Design a protein with these regions (language model features):
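Conserved GNAT acetyl-CoA-binding A-motif
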Residues: 64-77
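Conserved G/P- and acidic residue-centered "switch" motifs that form tight phosphate/ATP-binding loops
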Residues: 51-53, 107
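Conserved beta-strand-loop-alpha-helix junction that forms the acyl-donor binding cleft
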Residues: 48, 74-84
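Acetyl-CoA-dependent GNAT
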Residues: 1-46, 57, 63, 118-120
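Conserved catalytic-core motifs of GNAT/GCN5-like acyltransferases
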Residues: 23, 75-76, 89, 94-111, ...
């Protein structure tokens, strides 16, 4: 992904221990979605709620905007993941939809929440090709 110009970030503490990581990648491979990215962020369980995830996603947003992308999508694989949903809301994402029982995690069906945030000018203007 990094070789293709997409961001991959790792947060570490002073001792070099991994706290979390995040990345963005193309939302879909079709040309129509070339200005839209999907973010993913993962934070170690014992340090959630301490700002690591927010710092990672904020940096992903900044890098996506610098790349000229116009929309960022978050696909949250469990509607009960209030931490991730709240994190994305705090950074300007809004809920775009819920896919019922679209995922299977830990032996149960989960609803998948899709969230969206405009980047830069968003849909206000056409991007430079």
């Amino acid at each position: 992904m990094a070789a293709a110009g997409f961001a991959w970030l790792v947060a570490v503490d002073e001792a070099g221990q991994v706290l979390g990581y995040g990345y963005f990648a193309p939302f879909r491979e079709r040309s129509a979605y070339r200005f839209t990215a999907e973010d993913s962020v993962y934070v170690r369980d014992d340090i959630r709620g301490q700002g690591v995830g927010k710092a990672l996603v904020a940096e992903l947003i900044a890098r996506a905007e610098a790349k000229g992308l116009r929309q960022m999508i978050a696909v949250i694989g469990d509607s009960e993941n209030v931490g991730s949903i709240g994190l994305h809301i705090s950074l300007g994402f809004r809920q775009a939809g819920v896919l019922k029982a679209a995922g299977m995690k830990f032996g149960r069906w989960v609803d998948v929440v899709t969230m969206q945030r405009a980047l830069g000018e968003g849909e206000k203007t056409l991007p430079a090709e």
